[in-house]
Regions:
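Positively charged n-region of N-terminal signal peptides that target proteins for export
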Residues: 1-4
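Sec-exported extracytoplasmic/periplasmic mature domains
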Residues: 26, 30, 34, 50, ...
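Sequence/structural segment immediately N-terminal to covalent heme-attachment motifs in c-type
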Residues: 18-40, 45
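Short Fe-S-cluster ligation motifs
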Residues: 57-78
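N-terminal signal peptide c-region/cleavage motif recognized by signal peptidases
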Residues: 11-16
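Short glycine/threonine-rich turn/loop motifs
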Residues: 39-63
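C-terminal capping alpha-helices of c-type cytochrome domains
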Residues: 73-114
């Protein structure tokens, strides 16, 4: 009973859009990216919104992404997710997210992960 109450409180504290975003993130991005420690495959996306592009010291970024520079804003993340190769030619990122609602859900979720 106590565990169920704790679970209900946790679910109530999580906005529905964040839960949806987390599910979309896990489906579209979670195969390579985490919101915890960096994997060998891809950099962590914890705190990505507002972070300088290609700035984590524990990940070896592609020359294309390093050359892009800038900051990961909501608009930049949307453009990158739409077509990574067009946004940063030479990037190793190969997965795009063509659906605008999915991209928005992912970005909204990433804004909550600090």
């Amino acid at each position: 009973m106590r565990a169920a109450l704790i679970l209900l409180l946790m679910l109530a504290a999580t906005p529905a859009w964040a839960a949806t975003g987390e599910a979309v993130f896990n489906d579209k991005c979670g195969g390579c990216h985490t919101v915890g420690p960096a994997s060998e495959t891809a950099p962590t996306l914890k705190g990505v919104v507002g972070r300088k592009v290609a700035s984590l010291t524990d990940y070896q970024y592609s020359d294309g992404l390093k050359a892009k520079g800038g900051v990961w804003t909501e608009a930049a993340l949307d453009a990158f997710l739409t077509d990574p190769k067009a946004y940063a030619p030479g990037t190793e990122m190969f997965v795009s997210v063509p659906d605008a609602a999915d991209r928005q859900a992912i970005v909204d979720y990433l804004k909550t992960v600090h």
